[in-house]
Amino acid sequence: MKMKRFIYGLTVATSLVFATSCEEKLDELLENPNAVNAATASPDFLLNRIQLDYQGFWFGVSDRGARLTRQINQGSALYEAAYISGSTNGTWSNAYANILADIKFLEPLAVAANLQRHLGIAKTIKAMVLIDMVDTYDDVPYSEAIDAANFNPKTDDGAAIYAAALVLLNEASGHFTANPSTGTPNDYFYNRNYTRWVRLVNTLKLRYFLNTKLVSASESRAGINALITENNMLRDTDDFVFQFGTTAADPDSRHPKFADQYTSGGGDYQSTDYMWRLTEDKGFDDPRARYYFYRQSLTNTTNPAEQECITQLPPPQYLIGGFPYCNPGTRGYWGRDHLDPDGIPPDGLRRTAYGVYPSAGRFDNNSATPVNNPQLGGRGAGIHPIMLAAYVDFMLAEAALTLGTTGDPKAYMTSGVRKHLNYVRSWSLTTSEGSVISAFTPAADYTRSVDNYVTFVAARYDAAASSNDKLNVISTEYWLALFGNGKESFNLYRRTGTPLRMQPALEEKPGAFVRTFLYPNNYMVTNTNAVQKPNLAQQVFWDTNPASPWIY
């Protein structure tokens, strides 16, 4: 018994000594060895994550804009039903919890290591995110955001955030040319061609001045003229795109529109209005139509179980305005009208699908077979056309016409049209659909169709009676070139009120058009300083145009 007590006592004493000696190390033991901190973080990996998160963020913003501007179908009968407080939760969290937080973490690491190119890319993306957030919501948290000591940041004025983004763009240009610079970032966009990054920055400045032209025409005019004089914006081959792959396994590297539609059919409905503009409006097919859309059927259905609207009269506002309804023509271009709330009939392998551009689906060579096979077409190796060289010409055309900046608006417009028509084909030929495209449309035939199209558009511009009519021609052609980029389409519509004659909603009174979105639910329930907007009709600071229904 005495021996047992001795052993027990010795064990307790030893344990106490051990515990005492470890007490000083307790804080160290509580640290997670797998947690990323400033000492262990890789600036390269951080920048990788920032770039990947940005493409996802941009896609969410772009997709909503495309639906609102009739580039693809917008479901729901009313705008307020289509876009509730929770509709943009992902955009908000991706911006703040991912991209902006990671950039804030990256910046001091990059400064300490003199990673100038990392800083240039990060600040360019930061500026784009800030501008996109203002374009989406107007006032958002900025100066008090991403602060571990402040869980309830207040919003900043949208105009002030825009100005801060312009400062970031100027700083980014300096980082792209600074010497010396260490490090070789993994650049998903330009493969470390920093001359192109500088041209992108200048192009983003052009967009900044164009968006703010209604706030300060003189500042915008001077800013754009300076950029024209410098002559260093995006040119052919400088297109700022995110390139997808063909891997279906997790993580799926394919274009999201392809993955959604070509796996088992179904997916988005195309916009009846947009397809009509590309296939019927001019009396001949837009050369891009077969690249944008793939018809799973070459004829319209006669079965109302597949397409209910074929047995129904158009709404009164369609009849009075002479708008396309239900189907754009008779050749199997099968989509839906704006704000169509109907359910989903068995038409997944009949409705018009996404084509080869930009989501790397199939080129429409009249084969008219279902798209329920992920090995079809370009297999999803598509792109996000975030900022193309052709867009520069359209923006300069608008600026020349509305601000009187240097240059001829018609020449800019026709240059943009030709540049985009050629880009759509040249890019599509790089996909696995290249041989199909060349066999169906030889290069000489496509060139002839491009020439004819440009001639027609130029004549339409010349025939436009007023400046606003001429602006409508420019904007319509820009809008048609923006397939895959609803962000710029949404801004164009709010900024100019054009294209005119957008297809109306099926409901006669769908509510006010979305000028900015409601603040998301995940912000409203976590920030005590958050104040929700009264409705979707609140306008971004640079949109000083009349209230809706100026646009609808």
Can you name each region flagged by the protein language model?
Residues 20-29, 71-79, 134-142, 434-451:
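Short, compositionally biased low-complexity segments
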Residues 12, 22-24, 50, 127, ...:
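Terminal processing/anchoring signals of secreted or surface-associated proteins
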Residues 59-67, 138-140, 221, 488-491:
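Beta-strand acidic-aromatic groove motif in beta-rich domains, primarily in extracellular
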Residues 22-69, 75-78, 86, 90, ...:
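Membrane-proximal, proline-rich intrinsically disordered regions
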Residues 1-20:
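Sec-dependent bacterial lipoprotein signal peptides
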Residues 71-428, 464-469:
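Structured, solvent-exposed acidic/aromatic patches
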Residues 420-552:
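C-terminal functional modules
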